[in-house]
Amino acid sequence: MAHDFLTVGAAAPLQEAAVTALNFGDEYYKGLQEKYTSLRNLFLAGLDQAGIPHTTPQGAYYVLADISEFGYKSDLEFCEVLAEKCGVGAVPGSSFFRENVNHLIRFHFAKKESTLSAALERLMHIRETVPFKGR
């Protein structure tokens, strides 16, 4: 019986939350769009300034950055080194592809502006702090 309660039907609190969200006015969602567009633009401008090639998301809150120039065969290893040496967290892009893709990492930009600015300041020095492989 407990199994039925956990797997059949949506939980009542989640249904109430969904109704609340559906009743928000258009201005709320327009404000969210403006906020996240602004954060995206800030982050992409910083990546551009740091010379880090990247995708331009059209609706997602993350960006894929190309790490090919660093020579790592493993995006996981690169992410570990990036966190340790540069102090910036990223997710290996290979986590999101069926194919063997190891030259992309994913950054999440739905953060406080101050957090993004701090990360971008660190990424400005990525070529000095993250060792290159195979050179």
Regions found by a protein language model. Give the residues of each.
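PLP-dependent class I/II
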Residues: 1-135
